[in-house]
Amino acid sequence: MKIVVIGGGAAGMMFSTQYKKANPEDEVILFEKSSYVAWAGCPTPYFIADELKKSDVLHGTPEDFIKRGINVKIHHEVTKIDFENKTLTVKGNEINGIISYDKLVIAVGAKSFVPNIAGYSQNLENVFTLSHAEHAFKIKDFLNENKPKLKNAVVVGAGFIGLEMAESFRKNGLNVTLIE
C-alpha cells in the first residue's frame, strides 16, 4: 500500500513514524514544503527566549526519518489533490508532476490568521507570524541581530503561543503589548 502524507510537522511525522512501524511493508512518502520536519510548535517561544536549544524543538532531520523507511521529500509542495483518481500534483526539487496514492493523510498544521490591517505586508521586516519552524528562526535571528535597538513588541493573539511569545519578548528585555 502507498501512503502519502502532506505536512512534515509534529502530526505528519508522528503519523508516518507510527504507521511505518506498524506496517513496515507499506510505502510511506511525506511531502514538506519547507526545510524542516518534526517541528514541535508548542515550545517555540522558549526556543526564541534561548531557554531551549534547536534540538529541543526539532525532533529529527529528514535523513533520520529516511533511515526509518519514510520517504521524506522536503522542498516539495502539493499543489493539487484529485480525490476521485487518488492522485496529487507535486512541485519540488526531486518530483514535479502527478503521483498516485492509496491512502492520503493531510497534516499541514495551522496557518496564522492575519487581520486586515492597512499598510500590512508580509514583506515588512519587523512583522512576523508564527506557525512554523522557519518563522521561529526568523524571529530569533531578528531579535539577535537587532537586540540593542529593539524596545517594544506587539503580540496579536492571546492564546497559549501568544502569551508565551509575550513572555519570551519580556525575557528579551522588550516592553510588550498584547492584543486579543
Language model segments and positions:
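Beta1-alpha1 glycine-rich phosphate/pyrophosphate-binding loop at the start
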Residues: 1-71, 168-180
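FAD-binding core/adjacent interface of flavoenzyme oxidoreductases
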Residues: 1-4, 61-154, 177
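Glycine-rich Rossmann-fold phosphate-binding loop(s) that bind the pyrophosphate
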Residues: 7-10, 131-132, 157-159
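Glycine-rich nucleophile elbow surrounding the catalytic serine of serine-hydrolase chemistry
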Residues: 13-14, 160-164
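Short, mixed-charge, low-aromatic patches
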Residues: 17-23, 37-38, 91-98, 153-159
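Flexible loop residues that form catalytic
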Residues: 33, 109-110, 158
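Conserved acidic functional residues
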Residues: 82, 164, 180
